[in-house]
């Protein structure tokens, strides 16, 4: 332990001094109350704070806490002449508490380090030059300067400069993102290369990093079912065990006093034996292993997920996600890129594919329509605007233009009919762009939304994890939906749906399934469905306020494979929680029985309390470590 706090170092020194004094007393030939008086020094050195807290607890009516139980057990041991054991039990207890405090502190420090993404200062441009100010003091519309190596303090738009950004703290991905003038920039990223002047678009309290931190910090308020169970369990468990300990002492003691012939279980015992057993019972009764480790497991799971760019709004959602056996996807922007791209070119005889694409792209040179943008991006030849003239946009039809002196038409079937040109239909899914050159049909170009590179792998991973059903909902045509679903290996698809229809479909699926249903959407247009599903997952939440507000879980980037990562983290967290519950209850049950039978020494009872808690906390800390840490 090289990073102990001042309080922890003080406790360590008390433990060492008390242990040394106890060893000294053990070595001296002391007996009776002389030995008892000598043991008082190490006992009070190591246990004075426990005794003080126990007394305050009694005054305040907090009888059933661990300080009261430990004080009662050790004072009782002292009163029956078990001086060495009283000191040893308190020493063992405080040592366990030190390790426990260290483990909890380390885990919380690790989680805090994960979320240490909010800069403390911003470089504000003023009439007097650059001033270093608190981000909260920067008004919307102000210009800030972000130097290479600095973390972006506020959301804004790049006014001047270009650079690359490290978004790993937000998305979990190490690949830098390029940025230039006009691009949006969000707080929490690290500027890697160039100096940037940024116009602030949001106040500090509404910035992306503030919303993320608020979300993670508030996640502990939404407790999982397991956490709620432990809270209720502890409320009744401790008093029941205390009363059982009291009965374990009083009943045999009374029977010893009044029965002329003792039954077998009382034979050979005296009242102090039963007092010792009752005190052992008391030590075991504290449920701190569960009360501390279960919430810590969920908090660690949420912190570990945030390292991967997955924000979970509470332990209840993490626990629900672990039970998900149906995943429903929106299509556009979730499984597909949500942007048009040329997927096929079908030239007519006498024309080349590159020629058809080039003429179409040149004709669409001045258009801002998404289809025009996709044509220009697909054309590898230079876009020389001097080759284009007499551009005429025909609403609802397309564009007519002169390219290299040739009359070119680019548009839909209505444009072909307007020109009295015979055109060929296409059965491929997507938007069909027909092209004519000097009145002759040159061919058609298919423009379609493309599946994301990892979309198919995401479905494969989900099925490998035991997800029973993957479903796609879309407002697109049945042909397009069938093509995407078939390419990705989805189990079902439902097409041509309005937003209200999607809610209806999800409700139908909820009635069919026994497990939990997760819906994955873009978080902007899918708010009703995100709310209706057992778990609403918004994808692409980086910079999207609507996504962060609408969903239970937010994926900060656009990778569908993150869904499988989120489920793995959820299942691991719930598995660790169950391990801790089973381990703690099993050990306590065994030692309780041993204590009642007089087979458990007091130090074993302390282990069943503090030792089990320490081991459970160490196990809970595993929730912090994810697949990303193994790379």
For the regions a language model picked out, list residue spans one by one.
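Membrane-embedded alpha-helical bundles of multi-pass transporters
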Residues: 1-6, 23-32, 49, 53-59, ...
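Actuator/coupling domain of P-type ATPases
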Residues: 2-5, 26-27, 32-33, 39-125, ...
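Bilayer-spanning, highly hydrophobic alpha-helical transmembrane segments
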Residues: 15-20, 229-264, 281-298, 578-607
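Small-residue-enriched core segments of transmembrane alpha-helices in multipass membrane transport
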Residues: 43, 94, 236, 267-289, ...
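Residue-level signature of catalytic and energy-coupling elements of molecular machines
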Residues: 54, 82, 103, 122, ...
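Conserved catalytic phosphorylation-site environment of P-type ATPases
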Residues: 59, 69-71, 106, 120, ...
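Cytosolic catalytic headpiece
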Residues: 113-114, 141, 215, 315-535, ...
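Conserved cytosolic headpiece of P-type ATPases
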Residues: 122, 133, 154-155, 161, ...
């Amino acid at each position: 332990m090289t990073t102990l706090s001042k309080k922890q170092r003080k406790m360590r020194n008390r433990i060492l001094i008390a242990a040394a004094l106890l060893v000294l007393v053990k070595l001296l030939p002391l007996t009776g109350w002389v030995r008892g008086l000598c043991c008082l020094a190490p006992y009070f050195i190591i246990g004075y704070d426990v005794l003080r807290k126990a007394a305050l607890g009694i005054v305040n009516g907090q009888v059933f806490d661990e300080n009261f139980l430990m004080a009662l057990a050790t004072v009782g041991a002292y009163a029956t002449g078990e001086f060495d054991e009283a000191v040893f039990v308190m020493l063992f207890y405080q040592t366990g508490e030190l390790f426990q405090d260290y483990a909890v502190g380390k885990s919380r420090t690790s989680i805090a380090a994960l979320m240490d993404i909010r800069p403390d200062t911003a470089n504000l441009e003023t009439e007097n030059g650059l001033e270093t100010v608190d981000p909260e003091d920067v008004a919307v519309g102000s210009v800030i300067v972000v130097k290479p190596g600095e973390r972006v303090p506020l959301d804004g738009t790049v006014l001047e400069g270009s650079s690359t950004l490290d978004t790993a703290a937000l998305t979990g991905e190490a690949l830098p993102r390029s940025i230039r003038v006009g691009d949006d920039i969000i707080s929490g990223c690290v500027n890697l290369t160039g100096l940037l002047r940024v116009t602030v678009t949001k106040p500090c309290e509404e910035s992306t990093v503030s919303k993320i931190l608020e979300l993670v910090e508030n996640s502990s308020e939404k407790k999982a079912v397991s956490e709620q169970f432990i809270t209720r369990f502890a409320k009744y468990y401790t008093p029941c065990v205390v009363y059982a300990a009291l009965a374990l002492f009083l009943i045999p003691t009374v029977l010893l006093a009044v029965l002329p012939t003792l039954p077998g279980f009382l034979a050979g015992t005296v009242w102090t034996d039963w007092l010792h057993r009752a005190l052992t019972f008391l030590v075991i009764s504290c449920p701190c292993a569960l009360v501390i480790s279960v919430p810590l497991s969920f908090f660690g799971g949420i912190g570990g997920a945030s390292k991967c760019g997955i924000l979970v709004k509470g332990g209840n959602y993490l626990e629900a996600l672990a039970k998900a056996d149906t995943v429903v996807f929106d299509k556009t922007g979730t499984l597909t890129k949500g942007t048009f791209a040329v997927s096929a070119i079908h030239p007519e005889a006498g024309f080349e594919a590159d020629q058809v694409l080039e003429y179409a792209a040149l004709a669409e040179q001045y258009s801002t329509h998404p289809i025009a943008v996709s044509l220009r991006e697909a054309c590898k030849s230079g876009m020389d605007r001097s080759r284009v003239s007499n551009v005429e946009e025909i609403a609802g039809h397309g564009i007519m233009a002169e390219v290299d002196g040739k009359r070119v038409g680019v548009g839909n079937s209505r444009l072909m009919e307007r020109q009295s040109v015979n055109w060929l239909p296409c059965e491929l899914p997507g938007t069909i762009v027909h092209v004519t050159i000097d009145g002759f049909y040159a061919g058609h170009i298919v423009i379609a939304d493309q599946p994301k590179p990892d979309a198919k792998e995401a479905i494969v991973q989900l099925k490998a994890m035991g997800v029973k059903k993957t479903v796609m909902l879309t407002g697109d045509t049945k042909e397009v939906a069938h093509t995407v679903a078939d390419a990705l290996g989805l189990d079902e698809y439902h097409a041509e749906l309005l937003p209200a229809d999607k809610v209806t479909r999800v409700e139908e699926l909820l009635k069919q399934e026994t497990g939990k249903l997760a819906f994955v959407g873009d978080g902007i247009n899918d708010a009703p469905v995100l709310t209706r599903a057992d778990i609403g997952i918004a994808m692409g939440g980086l910079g999207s306020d609507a996504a962060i507000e609408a969903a239970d879980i937010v994926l900060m980037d656009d990778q569908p494979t993150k869904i499988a990562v989120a489920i793995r983290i959820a299942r691991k967290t719930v598995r660790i929680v169950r391990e801790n519950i089973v381990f703690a209850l099993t050990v306590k049950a065994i030692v309780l029985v041993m204590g009642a039978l007089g087979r458990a020494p007091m130090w074993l009872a302390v282990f069943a309390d503090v030792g089990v808690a320490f081991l459970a906390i160490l196990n809970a800390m595993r929730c912090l470590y994810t697949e990303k840490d193994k790379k």
